């Protein structure tokens, strides 16, 4: 049997080989926009496994353009992982690409009229557990330009495509063939979640908060479509976008097999989906097309099965993904169509305080940590990353495939977006966003505004997002701050200090 890209790779892109056929390991050693050790330099040449010795935000001015035969392994980063911000990325012309656990966040200062991520030509690619946001045209599109190879045999799986920027705000235009869209979250895109043409499978996706277009049946071009649409969940949000399915403007028959698709249109904070019966357009088939088999969850179970793991979840989700997942969990009550990412409450990535973590010891510099090599029978003192193991993967692929949530550096993230809510003469209520992992709770400290002695006044349980401080003096100005704690005596950094006051 043909070797899968990684053991649970699915869909038409599942045989991409990246740099397995011969290449080199490239270490990203800094967060610079360009130059030696940068991500831009790493992707400028073909035939590379790209690993990360650093964590943080890479601020880019120009778009990143990827070469052939690359494997970008974001889960190898220490700390809180890698976020790319400032412009979009292009995989056009790049064959045989593997991208995992990366975040690409374009932003309103990016190249005008461009996607956050796009493919116009090139084949055999898989994007798994990645996050894409803030595109100025689409968030992630595969749209042929009739140059080079037709963009076919591509999988986008376990990814988040979110917050396409207004006025366009579109999830994706999918007008190619042999495209698998599997277990993704499309959120806060006004339209095109996706707009689909050609040979396509759309399985186990969640779409949340669209306005004038959710799943659009048929693209903008000529040609017939043959599509499986199975086990998806559509949840209306504040943009109140109506039915999940609508017809497209393109010419040609839209032939589809639709089964087990659900929509919750109540926008009331309760999960009450109904199975879709109105597909609006197209020619419905009674037998599914014989496309690549893939495991399926029931469409009405995706909140519990997909939402906890979707996006670039290793080593930790970033603030943007945490924010979007919280919106989905509100079940219709939260969500917005965004014009400028600078308006988000947690700030833009270039201002984030990202924990860098600790690079694992790798004596021979082959991209595989010594501890893993010793445990798995490879040589920590010899560059053996590209040696093909008995299971058909290169040694470095076996290392990458082994990385799980249990391998990340232990880290308590501080509570985000701490806000004053209300007060009485003796109480003050605060709220915050809980983007922290594995905390046992949060502790709240205050001091009078003209004093410097901080005092802990409350402790909350894990996963809490608010606290009422009691027993305060009337008519007094206070400063407040919050941090996460774990019972092992570990603490996060403090949140920024907040000014507040009791009523007289």
Predicted segments with their positions:
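Acidic Gly/Asp/Thr-rich repetitive segments characteristic of extracellular carbohydrate-active
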Residues: 4-50
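Extracellular beta-rich repeat passengers
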Residues: 196-344
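Beta-strand-rich modules
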Residues: 469-488
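Right-handed parallel beta-helix
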Residues: 69-74, 78, 95-106, 123-137, ...
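Extracellular beta-strand-rich solenoid/capping regions of secreted or surface-exposed proteins
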Residues: 40-46, 57-73, 82-100, 106-123
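Extracellular calcium-associated, cysteine-rich motifs in secreted modular proteins
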Residues: 344-411
């Amino acid at each position: 049997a043909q070797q899968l890209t990684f053991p649970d790779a699915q869909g038409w892109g599942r045989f991409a080989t990246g740099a397995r056929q011969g290449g080199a390991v490239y270490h990203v050693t800094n967060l610079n926009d360009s130059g030696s050790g940068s991500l831009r330099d790493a992707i400028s040449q073909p035939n590379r496994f790209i690993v990360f010795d650093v964590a943080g935000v890479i601020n880019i001015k120009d778009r990143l353009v990827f070469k052939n035969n690359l494997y970008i392994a974001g889960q190898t980063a220490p700390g809180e992982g890698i976020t790319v911000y400032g412009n979009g990325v292009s995989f056009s012309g790049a064959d045989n690409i593997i991208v995992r656990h990366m975040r690409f966040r374009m932003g309103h200062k990016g190249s005008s009229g461009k996607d956050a991520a796009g493919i116009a030509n090139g084949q055999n690619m898989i994007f798994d557990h990645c996050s894409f946001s803030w595109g100025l045209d689409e968030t992630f599109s595969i749209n042929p330009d009739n140059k080079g190879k037709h963009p076919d045999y591509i999988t986008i799986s376990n990814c988040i495509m979110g917050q396409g920027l207004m006025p366009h705000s579109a999830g994706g235009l999918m007008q190619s063939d042999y495209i698998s869209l599997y277990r993704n979250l499309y959120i806060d895109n006004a339209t095109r979640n996706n707009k689909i043409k050609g040979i396509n499978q759309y399985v186990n996706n969640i779409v949340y908060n669209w306005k004038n277009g959710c799943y659009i049946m048929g693209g903008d071009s000529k040609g017939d479509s043959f599509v499986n649409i199975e086990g998806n969940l559509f949840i209306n949000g504040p943009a109140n976008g109506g039915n999940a399915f609508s017809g497209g403007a393109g010419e040609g028959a839209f032939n589809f097999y639709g089964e087990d698709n659900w929509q919750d249109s109540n926008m009331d904070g309760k999960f009450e989906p109904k199975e879709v019966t109105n597909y609006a357009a197209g020619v419905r088939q009674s037998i599914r097309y014989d496309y690549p088999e893939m495991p399926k969850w029931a469409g009405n179970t995706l909140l519990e099965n997909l939402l906890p793991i979707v996006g670039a979840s290793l080593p930790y989700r970033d603030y943007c993904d945490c924010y979007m997942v919280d919106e989905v969990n509100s079940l219709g009550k939260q969500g917005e169509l965004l014009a400028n990412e600078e308006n988000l409450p947690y700030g833009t990535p270039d201002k984030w305080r990202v924990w860098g973590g600790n690079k694992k010891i790798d004596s021979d510099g082959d991209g595989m940590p010594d501890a893993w090599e010793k445990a798995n029978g490879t040589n920590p003192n010899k560059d053996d990353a590209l040696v093909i193991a008995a299971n058909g993967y290169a040694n470095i692929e076996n290392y990458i495939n082994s990385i799980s949530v249990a391998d990340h550096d232990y880290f308590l993230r501080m509570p985000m977006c701490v806000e004053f809510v209300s007060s009485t003469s003796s109480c003050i209520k605060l709220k915050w966003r809980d983007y922290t992992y594995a905390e046992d709770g949060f502790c709240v400290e205050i001091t009078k505004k003209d004093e410097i002695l901080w005092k802990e006044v409350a402790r909350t349980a894990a996963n809490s997002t608010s606290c009422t401080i009691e027993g305060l003096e009337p008519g007094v100005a206070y400063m407040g701050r919050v941090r996460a704690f774990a019972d092992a005596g570990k603490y996060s950094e403090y949140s920024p200090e907040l000014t507040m006051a009791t009523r007289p």
